[in-house]
């Protein structure tokens, strides 16, 4: 009986403890954008790779019929300023993960569009693009 009470007490402590959730905003960094050919037409089915240069971890995404891709990378607060490499076929571009480490309320990320062999980063368009994709009203 005592062993059962100890196990129940331990279970209560484990269940009641806050768990470090991987889905928390301060562990996510989202890179999204569109891949188009040089004429501006969407390139569906393209593989988009985002490499975390510090660790070599590779995150893959694919474009949909509109050429849209979304890649979510696991980056913690300590990763602000970290270098990432975005690759679509032979085209690649170095990115810097820019965010305020203390801000745990706003989504972290950037928008990157690939047009032909040209890569254009639009960090200011990230939140509006994400809100549109999620169907949320823009702030």
Question: Where are the predicted features?
Answer:
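Positively charged n-region of N-terminal signal peptides that target proteins for export
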Residues: 1-4
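Short Pro-Gly-centered beta-turn/loop motif in secreted/extracellular proteins
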Residues: 70-82
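Beta-strand-rich domain onsets/edges
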Residues: 17-39, 125-139
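N-terminal export leaders
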Residues: 6-10
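Short, acidic Ser/Thr/Gly-rich low-complexity loop/linker segments typical of extracellular
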Residues: 54-72
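Short, ordered, surface-exposed loop/turn motifs in non-cytosolic proteins
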Residues: 38-53
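Edge beta-strands of extracellular beta-sandwich domains
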Residues: 93-102
């Amino acid at each position: 009986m005592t062993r059962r009470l100890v196990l129940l007490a331990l279970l209560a402590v484990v269940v009641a403890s806050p768990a470090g959730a991987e889905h928390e905003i301060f562990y996510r960094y989202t890179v999204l954008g569109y891949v188009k050919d040089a004429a501006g037409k969407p390139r569906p089915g393209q593989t988009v790779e985002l490499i975390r240069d510090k660790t070599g971890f590779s995150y893959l995404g694919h474009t949909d019929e509109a050429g849209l891709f979304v890649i979510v990378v696991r980056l913690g607060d300590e990763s602000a300023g970290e270098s990432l490499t975005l690759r679509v076929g032979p085209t690649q571009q170095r990115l810097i993960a820019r965010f305020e480490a203390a801000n745990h309320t706003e989504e972290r990320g950037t928008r990157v569009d690939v047009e032909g062999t040209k890569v254009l980063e639009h960090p200011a368009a990230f939140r509006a693009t994400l809100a549109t994709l999620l169907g949320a009203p823009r702030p």
